[in-house]
Amino acid sequence: VRPCSPPRPRRGSASHRACLIARYNFIYAKERLEAEAALRRYVCDLETVQRIIYIAVVESFRSAKMAFWKVKINVKDTLAICHRGGPSSLEVAVLDYIACHKDLYDVCCSVHEVVCSMNRNPKLPCPGEVDFVVISGLIRELCCLAFSMQTLIPPLDIAFGIDGECFNRDMYYRSFDSDFTAPFVAYHVWPALIEDGTVIVKGEVVTKK
């Protein structure tokens, strides 16, 4: 961590939050589809492709949040030396500092970690069938976005879904190829974005009987 320097003012956090939410929507609308197209060269089944991307999102957020936690500890230890306010103001100063110095995050390490984790996932095709490096661009964008979302108060996160759960219309949209009378989620296409337990952006699922 660098020597103490003035953090970015938090008054811009509302616009920063809006930009991060917009970025999440953009990744869903464009870069997710590009990743699907890249995977379809190796995997014919659309369901498998969508499962791969969903797990990539979940693993990217998990890896980025873990990396953020480690960076935050180091930054807090350093800023505490010269900080003159209370614990709450130190917390804000730490978040502002990390938001201002994004290069503290080694995103390449997270991308590698996510790819390795996916290669070991028993629900996905084995590494010999498809190399998940083909969607490393998507993984990188998700990791960077997830890391930045942790600098908000409260942070933004994704809701982790489970196959077979009851369909929640407040949290998900049904995919176009769903059985619209089915009450259960067959699999998840895209996770919902949440803030302090409240759904900010709905996810997408496939429902089948």
Residue ranges and their predicted role:
Residues V1-K209:
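Extended, amphipathic alpha-helical stalk segments that mediate dimerization
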